[in-house]
């Protein structure tokens, strides 16, 4: 099922797979991807970790920044990448 971006991030937070309409933002339940860049992961304790590609010097793209923003809402840990 093709979902809205905020729902993709929510499904990652629930450890479920999901994808948006064109596959540019997706989760396999463990990792969260913006295009082919892994922006989120799940550690051995089940904590959701988001890599902050919006920070100064680590900016990737406008779209990836939006995807990171959605992921932050469901992350336990935010890493400055």
Model regions: which residues?
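Terminal leader/tail segments of proteins
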Residues: 1-81
């Amino acid at each position: 099922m093709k979902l809205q971006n905020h729902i993709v991030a929510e499904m990652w937070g629930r450890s479920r797979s999901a994808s948006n309409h064109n596959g540019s933002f997706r989760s396999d339940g463990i990792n969260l991807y913006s295009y082919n860049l892994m922006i989120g992961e799940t550690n051995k304790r089940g904590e959701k970790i988001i890599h902050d590609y919006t920070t100064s010097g680590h900016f990737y793209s406008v779209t990836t920044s939006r995807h990171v923003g959605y992921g932050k809402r469901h992350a336990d840990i935010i890493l400055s990448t």
